[in-house]
């Protein structure tokens, strides 16, 4: 995969802070229907996101990282969310790109809108609407949004009500970031959460913002010190292997998804369970990937640490959570998980460690997730489990 280039030729300046983000993925449909492979033509997409920090100006990032041809964005708006696909009266703001209403993003690239005056508070939901008049081809997207996106035929970018948006999807399309500026002196205190489906929030309730990074942002806001907490988890992602439906391997996408975020101080890494459970024999519906050793996973983590330290970032390692009775459960896999966790806890390679394994484990059966925290598949936490994970993080240390 070619390295992503910024279409507008600019780099983020010191005034912008990441308020929301997601990691772009290759157009696939491994978990059920979505719109990524068919793309769009004369469609309006409306997407709802919750920002973790506030400001007085906003801009969005759009990605055509995995597009097969240039992507024409005919127009875009941002507004305050009302209910569903509806937005609040008087809140719609037209976005521009280099002072024009439209923009063409080359295949493999991304771009930012111009900043627009838009006062928004921490934990407030925004609605971003894109009008795509021309055929797009397959769409760069993010599979698991745990949020509803909406589609309408024709141009409805400025509609206040959601009547025209008769179709819905549980993925995000093209939208990869929301940044804010103003409202506070610039400071480098942002947090990136990086990982797989447990960071992505699989198992949490829809449209509830109960992923562990969401819960962490709520804790900061409740403590009176809101800050940007952005989520770069991809369900199924591995440290060491590319999967077409689960993103580039962590050691590669870290450069694109984490190291380009503005004003970040700390990265939290929770990744490796798919290297263990997804390697070797094929899981139904998935292609097999090479067998991955403990040593390879550890070396992948060391590479993430090297990349973070080279950019002056503090990096926190999280232990891998229980797999007993899940699709990944085996004696071999449990031994690998234990070995990786032992290294994370004792090596001193990470600047700090958060022991998510012990947070969500059943004290009486530590290889198993506590039933009260189990989403039902014995691998992913539920809302209560994600809340417990966020509570385990020391705000002052972060």
Q: Could you tell me what each predicted segment is?
A:
Residues 248, 291-302, 334, 338, ...:
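Non-membrane alpha-helical structural segments and their capping/turn regions in soluble enzymes
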Residues 301-309:
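Surface-exposed amphipathic alpha-helices with a cationic face
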Residues 63, 131, 194-197, 231-237, ...:
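Active-site-proximal beta-strand/loop segments in catalytic clefts of secreted hydrolases
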Residues 1-194, 204-206:
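N-terminal secretory targeting modules
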Residues 20, 41-47, 70, 74-79, ...:
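Conserved SGNH/GDSL esterase-like catalytic core that processes O-acyl groups on lipids
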Residues 238, 277, 284, 320-398:
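Catalytic His-Asp segment of secreted/periplasmic serine-dependent ester chemistry enzymes
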């Amino acid at each position: 995969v070619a390295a992503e280039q910024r279409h507008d030729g600019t780099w983020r300046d010191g005034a912008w802070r990441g308020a929301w983000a997601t990691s772009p993925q290759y157009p696939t449909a491994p978990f059920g229907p979505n719109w990524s492979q068919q793309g769009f033509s004369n469609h309006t997409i409306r997407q709802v996101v919750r920002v973790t920090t506030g400001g007085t100006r906003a801009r969005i990032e759009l990605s055509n990282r995995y597009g097969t041809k240039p992507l024409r964005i005919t127009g875009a708006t941002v507004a305050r969310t009302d209910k569903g696909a509806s937005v609040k009266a008087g809140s719609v703001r037209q976005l521009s790109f280099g002072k024009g209403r439209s923009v063409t993003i080359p295949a493999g690239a991304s771009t930012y809108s111009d900043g627009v005056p838009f006062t928004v508070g921490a934990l407030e939901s925004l609605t971003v609407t894109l009008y795509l008049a021309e055929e797009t081809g397959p769409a760069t997207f993010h599979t698991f949004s745990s949020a509803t996106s909406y589609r309408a035929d024709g141009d409805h970018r400025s509609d206040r009500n959601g009547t025209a948006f008769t179709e819905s999807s549980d993925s995000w399309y093209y939208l990869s970031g929301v940044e804010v500026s103003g409202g506070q002196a610039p400071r480098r205190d942002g947090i990136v959460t990086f990982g797989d489906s447990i960071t992505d929030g699989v198992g949490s309730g829809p449209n509830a913002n109960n992923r562990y990074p969401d819960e962490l942002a709520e804790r900061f806001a409740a403590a009176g010190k809101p800050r940007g907490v952005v989520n770069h988890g991809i369900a199924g992602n591995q440290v060491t292997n590319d999967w077409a439906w689960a993103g580039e391997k962590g050691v590669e996408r870290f450069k694109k998804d984490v190291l380009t975020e503005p004003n970040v101080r700390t990265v939290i890494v929770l990744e490796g369970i798919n290297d263990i459970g997804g390697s070797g024999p094929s899981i139904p519906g998935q292609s097999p990937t090479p067998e991955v050793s403990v040593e390879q996973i550890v070396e992948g983590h060391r590479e993430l640490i090297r990349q973070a330290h080279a950019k002056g970032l503090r990096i926190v390692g999280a232990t891998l959570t229980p797999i007993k009775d899940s699709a990944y459960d085996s004696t071999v896999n449990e031994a690998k998980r234990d070995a990786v966790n032992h290294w994370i806890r004792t090596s001193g390679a990470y600047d700090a460690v958060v022991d998510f394994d012990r947070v969500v484990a059943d004290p009486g059966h530590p290889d198993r997730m506590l039933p009260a925290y189990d989403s039902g598949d014995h691998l992913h936490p539920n809302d209560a489990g994600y809340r417990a994970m966020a509570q385990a993080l020391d705000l002052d240390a972060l």
